[in-house]
Each structure stands twice: as C-alpha cells, then as structure tokens.
Amino acid sequence: MVSRLKIHSGLRLWEFPDQYVIEPTDGSSASCLDISRLDGSMKLIDQVAECNSLRVPKIRSIFGVVGMLKLLAGSYLVVVTESESVGSFLGHPIYKINSLKFLPCDHSLENPHEEQKKMETDDYSRLLSVAERTTGLYFSYEINLTLTAQRLHDLGDESKLLPLWRQAEPRFLWNNYMLEVLIDNKLDQFLLPVIQGSFHSFQTAIGRDIVDITLIARRCSRRNGTRMWRRGADPDGYVANFVETEQIVRMNGYTSSFVQIRGSMPFMWEQIVDLTYKPKFEIVQPEEAARIAERHFLDLRKKYGSVLAVDLVNKHGGEGRLSERFAGAMQHITGDDVRYLHFDFHHICGHIHFERLAILYEQMEDFLEKNGYFLLNEKGEKMKEQLGIVRTNCIDCLDRTNVTQSMIGRKLLELQLKRIGVFGAEETIRSHQNFDECYKILWANHGDDISIQYSGTPALKGDFVRYGQRTIQGVLQDGWNALARYYLNNFADGTKQDAIDLVQGHYIVAVSRDMAPVPRKRGLEAVANFPVALTVILISFWFATMSVKQVGSGYKHLLFSLVWAGISVAVAALVRANGRIFCNRPSLHKPRS
C-alpha cells in the first residue's frame, strides 16, 4: 500500500529576500525546492549554498508543502508549520495539522502600476488569515488517507506504486486545487495530500485479545462550506456537508472496516440568515429536484453500490416541506439498489428517548446484513466486502445524524467482532465497561469535529453519544452552543465561506468576473452595520427611559421620550425588515437577496 516515491517527511524552510528554499532533512539525497518570491516560479536545485544573499535568511522547520495559491498580484506558498502525531491508519503514522502558513511571493507589488491589485490582494490576505485557522486537517507521508481500507486493498499493483496524490480520491483531497502548480512542475516528493475531517482511535483489551478501533472522517470538498451558506445540492448533485465515515477494527491480524456517509438533502434549497433564530427554508428550482437527486444517487451507486437513504428530519413545519420534496424526488429513484427510509427523529425520540433508535435499526437491519462490511483475514485475503452504504441526513447532518450513525456503527462493530470470534453470540460492547466508555468518547469526538468545521460549535446532543444518556449539563451546553451557532452564522460565517471558496478554488481570482472580493455597495447595504445599529437602539432606549422618569418636570421630557423611543423603534424595525443585509454575507459567491 505504500507508494514507491515517498513524500519528504522532514523539511527545512530557508526564507531569503528573493526566494524560498525548501531543503529535505529526512536523510534523503534529494534536491532542494527553490521558489521565487518575485513570481512564484519553482525549480529544483542541488543545495542551499547555490542561493546567494547579502542578508541572513530566516530558517524554520516545516512538515509539508500544502500547495501554491495564485492571486492577482502574486502567489502564496502554503506550508505546514506545526503538526502532531495522532495515531496510525492501517499501520501507518497519521498527523494532524495544528498550524498553516501562507507565505507571500508578492514582490511584484512594489511596481507602482500594481497599486490596484495591491488593494484587492489586501482583502484576500484577510481571508487567508481565516484560512490559516482551518480545523480538522490530517495527512500521512506513507498512505493514502482519501481511500477506504477496501479501496486501498482493491488498488492494482501499479496504482499502489504511484505517488500518493495520483492515488487520491479528488473529492476528499482538501488541497486538490492548491496542488496544481506543484503537479505541473512534477514535484511529487513535495506534494502532501491533505484531508479535512476527523481521526480518532483507541486500543482496548477484551479478554486476552487487544483490539484497535479507528474512526476516520473524510469531508468532500466539492460543496464545502459553512452551515447556513452551504445547504442542499448544486445542479450537478454534489451536496453540502458530505462526509464519509469509516470505522476500522484490527485484531489478531484481522482488519475489518465499515463505511457510512452523511450529506445534505440532495436538491437545491437554502436557508439564508436574516437575524431570526430560524430563517425560513426556501426550495430553489423545485422542478429540478428529481433530476438533481437522481444525479446524486447515480453517483453514490457508482462509488458505493446499493444505497439506503435515512431521512431524519421532522415530518411537519418547515422541515416537513423539505422532507416531502425529498420523498417525492425519491419516488422516481428507489428500486432494488436504492431505498428511502424516513424516521422523524424528534417526534419518535424527543429530546431524551434516544433508545428508540432501536425502531430505526429494525427497519434497516436487513439492508446492513445484506451489504455487510469489509474483512481481511490474517493473510491479507479478502473474506467479505461492503456492497452498499447507509446515507444519513437531518437538516444540518450534524446532531441527529451523529447520534444515529454512532448507533449504526455500534451495531456493525458488534457484528464484526462476532465474525472475528472476539464476541460470543449474545455479547455486546456494553458487556465491557472500558470498551463501551472508550467507544462513546470516540464517536462524541468524531461528531464534535465534524460539527465544528460546519457550524463552528461542537455537536448538540453530544452528551448522549458520550455518556449514553442526556444530562442537565449537556442540555445547558446545547443551549450555549445553539446561541454560539446563531452568532457565528449571522456575523462570522460569510467571511469564513469566502476563505473556503478562495483556497479550494471555488472562486478563482485570475478569471473571476469580479476582480475584487468586495464590490462597491449601494444604498442601505453600504451603511448597514449591525453593531452600530444595536448601539443606536440601546442608547435611544436608555435616553427614552431617562426622559420618561422626568415627565413630571414638564412636557418637554415627554416629547424627548417619544422622540428617543421613536428612533429606537424605527432603527429596530429597519434592522428587522432588512435582516439579511445586516448579516455577514459571502462576497465572492454572492447569495440571492
């Protein structure tokens, strides 16, 4: 499974005034990579000594080259400046990125004719500062993290010898766009494939057996984004918050994995923030829903085989309209290899009775038993393969989805352990307290990671996944996280969405119609500022209150009170009527008003 051409696992970055030089320090005798700070051009050189400079260079250790991002006035070299080991995937070390750095190759900005580009790039630089704080990024120098254990096993011998980026599944390659320049320059040993998602593992003893459990998530980059600015599907059927979750168990030479997926309802719908707690759901081009859903499930069948779509949204209200549209679209798709199953999570389970998910499992048990899981014996021979996939969704594909997926994962892990011979016929994970506690924590951390990337906060209902029951502390934490989501969705996620679109190539600066990320605003949009509006409302209300207290001193105070109250009400009404304008909105891909 290991690529013949290994990626450099140790690097030293030399920062000269006119160039960056990346020197391998992993014991190989490979060439150094020279990157011009004037135009971002690249070439291989024999040694750092070839670089002449009158100034002492800045030297630092780095852990990989993520890619090169081209902007109007120059390019940015993207490198890993901090990382940590988080475990192993099929026996190969895995690392988490703790710090990214975008290094500018922008000396061309000193040209006075480039002043306009400099102003525009300053705006993009602010987005890159947001991108540097991207969470949940993982890499390996030795193995392809974008592929499941089953797909890795099924790779042909020739494919296994290819560089890791050539083996990679593009939809799960977070830095796919930024690697293009390095690929064009044939710099395979410097190309570091990165995924976004989650990676956690633990080891436990069951009797005399040592069992390793790993849970890895791979986020699709095709429609990546934030909770409120990336909903539903695009016209090609790619959905928001699409995450592939793989659970791997290794014991006594056996390796077994089970894969499931989550993703937004596969038709075009949105929920544009407008300062209300729950913005309205809007179905876009409803006549296209069936076609887009069909395209989505056709893609899933090609990649995973049979599909069971589990829809957890409410049957009534705004969610009900979406669920009805989803069910209607599925009528034209369902057959022997695609099933649709609706389970009103909130109606059946409420806020505390999550044990009722057993009802859902009974309805999907035949599908899971038929389509199974992947299993290798001690000799590395395939004994079973997974033939289908469970696709779970709620509105956000976070909280209800994670509770449900953890239940499915638990049931399948018990089947796997019985098949390997670790568990007896009636034995369950709950029969082993330490195993049970570690497994709950594994899935709780997994859900939090995915939720933070999409919504900005840990998952709701996480206490049930972590402890097996709802707790008062968990309910209070959910309330706090819900408020935090409201703030982030309304006042921060527009900028974060722009940063995602920029680094993943969804908005390409050089060819985009709008050359600056922030077009000129007109009318109310040009002056709309929520903090200022809120300040005016509060100050006006305070003056109105003070004037009311002095009404007895004369009618003048009554008039002042009415004026200040009127200002407060008028500004509040203006903000309420134009809530979308007062929110933090993406500028690169402008949403509908």
UniProtKB/Swiss-Prot annotation:
Subcellular location: Endoplasmic reticulum membrane
Domain of life: Eukaryota
EC number, as in UniProt: 3.1.3.-
Top-level EC class as recorded in UniProt: hydrolase
Annotated membrane topology: Multi-pass membrane protein
Tissues expressing this chain: Predominantly expressed in flowers.
Transmembrane segments: 526-546, 555-575
Disruption phenotype: Impaired in BABA-induced sterility (ibs) and BABA-induced protection against P.syringae, H.parasitica, and salt. Affected in the priming for callose deposition.
Pfam families reported in the protein's UniProt record: Syja_N
Gene Ontology CC terms: endoplasmic reticulum; endoplasmic reticulum membrane
Induction profile: By salt stress.
Keywords from the named record: Endoplasmic reticulum, Hydrolase, Membrane, Transmembrane, Transmembrane helix
Intervals of motif Phosphatase catalytic core: 391-402
GO MF terms, alphabetically ordered: phosphatase activity
Main location: endoplasmic reticulum
Domain SAC positions: 128-456
GO biological process entries: response to salt stress
Domain remark in the UniProt entry: The phosphatase catalytic core motif (or RXNCXDCLDRTN motif) from the SAC domain is found in metal-independent protein phosphatases and inositol polyphosphate phosphatases.
Function, as annotated: Phosphoinositide phosphatase that hydrolyzes PtdIns(3)P and PtdIns(4)P. Involved in priming for different defense responses.
Entry protein name: Phosphoinositide phosphatase SAC6
Organism per entry: Arabidopsis thaliana (Mouse-ear cress)
